[in-house]
Amino acid sequence: AEITRGHVDVGPRLIDGKFVLLARDDSANPPVWRSTDDAVLRVVDASRIDVPNDDAYSFLGDMRGRKAYVIPQTQDQKIVWLGWNTQAPEIVKNFPRGAELVFTGHEGPGEAHMFIENGFEAPMSLYDSTKSEQQPVHMEANTHVHANWVFSEPGAQTISMEVRGTDAKGVKHSYPTKLRFVIGDKGSAQDARSMGASASATIADSPTATASSDSTAASSDASHGSSSHGAIIAIIAGVVIVAIVVAALIGRSRSRAMRDEVWQDG
């Protein structure tokens, strides 16, 4: 599936007892949890905005003062809205300490970044494709988070990651996969799919992975009902060694105010 707009969350699931990372596609009716090898996110030309030439965004390097393709932290109806959550009922039940998204690499033209903004505090970089080391982001239990995703160049791209978690019995689980993007209006979704199949290729968009069943109860009540209002209040929970601990609550009133304070449409 190629997804060009609407709400998408990646999140850990237990499918037939297997710990995996899937993408919940709310643009489908009913919503469905898709394999990350099938879901290709197109970041359209309408997402291009001016990157602030401000020291607060020094982690964006030469991208400052230039136009870039941005999936915003707060929803823009013209653009796909990518986040993550740990709200699947079986994850809430079996992984009380949440899970980690560990970013391990980027393939494709230019640079890719992800960062989060929290009101008047300085933006915090969560992922920088120019760094070679693993970059872990902790996902608190039963939370739903959105961040800013920034791409410098158009074209097919992937971001490799591994989801890791320790269940209530102390058993460690991990699952490597890739998020697949086509940046810009041109380019083929198939190009992104052909950039190396990941372990998630074995997980199909089957009835066991659909989001229209009881598996959506927690996430629907806590967050997705407010997606149309496009408001986010992000809470930074702390930093432990190199892991960034992030929690977020979905609000219902502020639309694009947080984004417009620093990101001006080009």
Residue ranges of predicted features:
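Compositionally biased, low-complexity repeat tracts
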Residues: 2, 13, 221, 226, ...
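Soluble mature domains adjacent to a membrane tether on cell-surface and organelle-surface proteins
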Residues: 2-206
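Extracellular Ser/Thr-rich, low-complexity/disordered mucin-like segments
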Residues: 205-239, 249
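C-terminal membrane-anchoring or membrane-association module
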Residues: 234-266
